[in-house]
């Protein structure tokens, strides 16, 4: 089974405001680029949407995935915090509702289908995959901004 490498990024103009997400999937010499955006969102939601859309694009289950993000929120949320949230009925340690619970639940479901190595990379530091994912996210943001009333 070959490993699929995914680079993701999100962008937002204002927080909240229009936002975009970008993802690159690479496997066996192939490459697929994805992007999208929303007219009213947050940076964290766009970081999460990039990962969700990339994982949803995988056609088969049981994939070995390396997912590279510059979002500590995304990486720590899915690898550390989510276990406690689920035990507490999607509440934080101080008993408040988890923000972005709709996306965390989607991501949780998607992670069950694959073996995922979640990795963090410093944003805007020259990593080619992160830089391209950022470009895609900004394109998604521009498209979302164009759809605003």
UniProtKB/Swiss-Prot annotation:
GO terms for molecular function: magnesium ion binding; nucleic acid binding; RNA-DNA hybrid ribonuclease activity. The keyword Hydrolase applies. One of its GO terms (biological process) is DNA replication, removal of RNA primer. It comes from the Bacteria. Mg(2+) 2 binds at residues 9, 134. The keyword Manganese does not apply. PROSITE patterns: RNASE_H_1. Keywords: Cytoplasm, Endonuclease, Hydrolase, Magnesium, Metal-binding, Nuclease. Residues 129-149 have a biased composition (Basic and acidic residues). One of its GO terms (cellular component) is cytoplasm. Residues 124-149 are annotated as: Disordered. Binds 1 Mg(2+) ion per subunit. May bind a second metal ion at a regulatory site, or after substrate binding. Gene3D superfamilies: Ribonuclease H-like superfamily/Ribonuclease H. SUPFAM superfamilies: Ribonuclease H-like. Residues 1-142 form the RNase H type-1 domain. It catalyses: Endonucleolytic cleavage to 5'-phosphomonoester. Its cofactor is Mg(2+). Mg(2+) 1 binds at residues 9, 47, 70. Its main location: cytoplasm. HAMAP family: RNase_H. Endonuclease that specifically degrades the RNA of RNA-DNA hybrids. Monomer. This is Ribonuclease H. It comes from Maricaulis maris (strain MCS10). The gene is rnhA.
């Amino acid at each position: 089974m070959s490993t699929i490498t995914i680079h993701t990024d999100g962008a937002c103009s204002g927080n909240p405001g229009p936002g975009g997400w970008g993802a690159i999937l690479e496997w066996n010499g192939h490459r697929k680029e994805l992007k999208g955006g929303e007219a009213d969102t947050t940076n964290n939601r766009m970081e999460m949407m990039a990962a969700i859309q990339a994982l949803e694009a995988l056609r088969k289950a049981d994939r070995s995935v390396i997912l590279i993000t510059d979002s500590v929120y995304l990486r720590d949320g899915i690898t550390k915090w989510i276990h406690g949230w689920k035990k507490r009925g999607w509440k934080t340690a101080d008993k408040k509702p988890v923000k972005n619970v709709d996306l965390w639940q989607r991501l949780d479901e998607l992670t069950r289908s694959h073996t995922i190595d979640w990795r963090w990379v410093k944003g805007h530091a020259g990593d080619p995959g992160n830089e391209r994912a950022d470009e895609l996210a900004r394109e998604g943001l521009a498209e979302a901004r164009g759809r605003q009333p």
